[in-house]
């Protein structure tokens, strides 16, 4: 069957039916994830028999014209447009006024403008917002994502840096406030789906254990002990989580070749269309390093239960290995609309605008070990996942700084992981930091990385 996207005639149209509304705040709407999320929401509004879908608010940093155009293209215009760069307020206000008078835009004067970093927090915590798509790139997305968690929202988490920087703070807040953290990264979404059997076993185990205990014990003991190994307690029967990596544009390059890599070569990802920062992270495999740290916090597993393999075709998005040697993999086209939609509609599955896999052709799928010697960022990611504490915040800040320096032609590509490692070694590690301490270290690590780049 040839690959094709769903068409207007291929699924029922429920837009004329009376359905309860699911409202979404899309933070980082002008990025690749944000644009894909808006496409998914438009499609869901048509094909979801149970809910109508609306964008309650959307944000951008300084890309005013694309943001206003996206807002005007929504079937129901957002009630609020957020521009996090306060210096762009006048330009944004003018663009919004102009759009509200144009017949090509659905925006009206009722759409208000909110400006500045605090506006992101307000958008994420509005009472009528059901789901927050956290798609702001980098450390800048932390406060709004954490605010959504504290507000008990379902968070479709695309901003991996939130967990890298403040994993224990965020996961604790989610547990205390009843928030749902559902991954948008294709790898973590795949792991989440592959763990479905283990979640079912966990529920069955808890029920069975309760049924055989004396009534006096049932009243006082939880179904499972929190002192057990996390992988055993939370995921019965799971041996390890296996994240796949495309290998990026330098998958077959030597270290010497990568030392001379140009910006254009590093930005030429063979599979995914992404923003500049995440594309450079993919080239250095720092993106996979950050995903290892994210998986540690998201699934509450130790670093030695996580593995990375290279899969150039990007069809297998991740795997879970079980104690009996079985492997369950999630396979789908390399299209971010699939994990985005799953995070929005979980546990329901509905028609998605992404194309299907072409089953009329042979599927070429290969897996091979990742090479931490050629990609030292990957080894650094496992090290950070093992030690936890302040390490994630420091490495993330150093990496964001180093990537920016590389994109401006100030350092070599291979300097990126070295600057990250040296910044990590230069800081005084703390195992149980406060959020305030993590934010201070973020500032320190950025400054230190710049100093190291000049040495």
From Swiss-Prot:
Can the keyword Chloroplast be found in this entry's annotation?
A: no
Q: Outline the segment boundaries, as ranges, of region: Disordered.
A: 205-233
Gene Ontology terms, MF aspect: 1-deoxy-D-xylulose-5-phosphate reductoisomerase activity; manganese ion binding; NADPH binding
Name-wise, this protein is 1-deoxy-D-xylulose 5-phosphate reductoisomerase
Q: What keywords were assigned to this record?
A: Isoprene biosynthesis, Manganese, Metal-binding, NADP, Oxidoreductase
Q: In which pathway does it act?
A: Isoprenoid biosynthesis; isopentenyl diphosphate biosynthesis via DXP pathway; isopentenyl diphosphate from 1-deoxy-D-xylulose 5-phosphate: step 1/6
Q: Which residues bind Mn(2+)?
A: 185, 187, 291
Q: Which reaction does it catalyse?
A: 2-C-methyl-D-erythritol 4-phosphate + NADP(+) = 1-deoxy-D-xylulose 5-phosphate + NADPH + H(+)
Q: Which GO terms describe its biological process?
A: isopentenyl diphosphate biosynthetic process, methylerythritol 4-phosphate pathway involved in terpenoid biosynthetic process
What's this chain's function? Catalyzes the NADPH-dependent rearrangement and reduction of 1-deoxy-D-xylulose-5-phosphate (DXP) to 2-C-methyl-D-erythritol 4-phosphate (MEP).
Q: Where does NADPH bind?
A: 30-33, 63, 159, 161, 275
SUPFAM superfamilies tied to this protein? 1-deoxy-D-xylulose-5-phosphate reductoisomerase, C-terminal domain (SSF69055), Glyceraldehyde-3-phosphate dehydrogenase-like, C-terminal domain (SSF55347), NAD(P)-binding Rossmann-fold domains (SSF51735)
Database matches in PANTHER family = 1-DEOXY-D-XYLULOSE 5-PHOSPHATE REDUCTOISOMERASE, 1-DEOXY-D-XYLULOSE 5-PHOSPHATE REDUCTOISOMERASE, CHLOROPLASTIC
**Cofactor(s) named in the record:** Mg(2+); Mn(2+)
Q: Which family does it belong to?
A: Belongs to the DXR family.
> Record-annotated residues binding 1-deoxy-D-xylulose 5-phosphate?
160, 186-187, 246, 269, 282, 287-288, 291
Top-level taxon of origin:
Bacteria
Enzyme Commission code: 1.1.1.267
Bias kind Polar residues: ranges? 205-214
Q: Does the keyword Oxidoreductase apply?
A: yes
EC class name: oxidoreductase
């Amino acid at each position: 069957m040839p690959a094709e996207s769903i068409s207007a005639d291929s699924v029922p149209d429920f837009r004329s039916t009376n359905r309860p509304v699911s409202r979404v705040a899309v933070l980082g709407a002008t990025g690749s994830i944000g644009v894909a999320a808006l496409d998914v929401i438009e499609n869901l509004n048509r094909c979801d028999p149970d809910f109508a879908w609306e964008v309650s608010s959307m944000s951008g940093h300084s890309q005013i014209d694309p943001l206003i155009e996206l807002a005007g293209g929504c079937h129901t215009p957002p009630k609020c447009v957020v521009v996090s760069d306060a210096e762009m307020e006048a330009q944004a206000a003018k663009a919004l006024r102009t759009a509200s008078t144009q017949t090509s835009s659905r925006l009206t004067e009722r759409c208000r403008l909110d400006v500045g970093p605090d506006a992101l927090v307000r958008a994420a915590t509005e009472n009528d917002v059901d789901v927050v798509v956290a798609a702001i790139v980098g450390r800048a997305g932390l406060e709004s994502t954490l605010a959504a968690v504290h507000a008990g929202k379902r968070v479709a988490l695309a901003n991996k840096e939130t967990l890298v920087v403040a994993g224990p703070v965020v996961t604790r807040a989610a547990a205390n406030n009843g928030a749902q953290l559902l991954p948008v990264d294709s790898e973590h979404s795949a792991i989440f789906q592959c763990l479905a059997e283990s979640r079912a076993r966990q529920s069955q185990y808890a029920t069975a254990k309760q049924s055989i205990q004396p009534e006096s014990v049932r009243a006082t003991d939880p179904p499972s002990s929190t002192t057990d190994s996390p992988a055993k307690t939370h995921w019965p029967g799971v041996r390890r989580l296996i994240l796949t990596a495309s290998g990026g544009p330098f998958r077959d390059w030597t270290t010497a070749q990568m030392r001379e890599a140009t910006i254009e070569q590093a930005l030429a990802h063979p599979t995914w269309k992404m923003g500049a920062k995440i594309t450079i992270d993919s080239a250095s495999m720092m993106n996979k390093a950050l995903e290892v740290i994210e998986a540690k916090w998201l699934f509450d597993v130790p670093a030695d239960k996580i593995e990375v393999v290279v899969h150039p075709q990007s069809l297998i998005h991740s795997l879970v290995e079980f104690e009996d040697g079985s492997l369950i993999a999630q396979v789908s086209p390399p299209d971010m609309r699939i994990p985005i939609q799953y995070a929005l509609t979980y546990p329901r599955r509905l028609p998605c605008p992404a194309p299907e896999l072409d089953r009329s052709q042979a599927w070429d799928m290969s897996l091979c070990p990742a090479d931490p010697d050629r990609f030292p960022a990957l080894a650094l990611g496992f090290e950070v996942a093992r030690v936890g504490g302040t390490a994630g915040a420091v490495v993330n800040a150093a990496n964001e700084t180093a990537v920016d320096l590389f994109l401006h032609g100030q350092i070599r590509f291979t300097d990126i992981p070295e600057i990250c490692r040296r910044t990590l070694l230069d800081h005084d590690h703390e195992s149980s930091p406060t959020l305030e301490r993590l934010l201070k270290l973020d500032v320190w690590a950025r400054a230190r990385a710049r100093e190291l780049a000049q040495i």
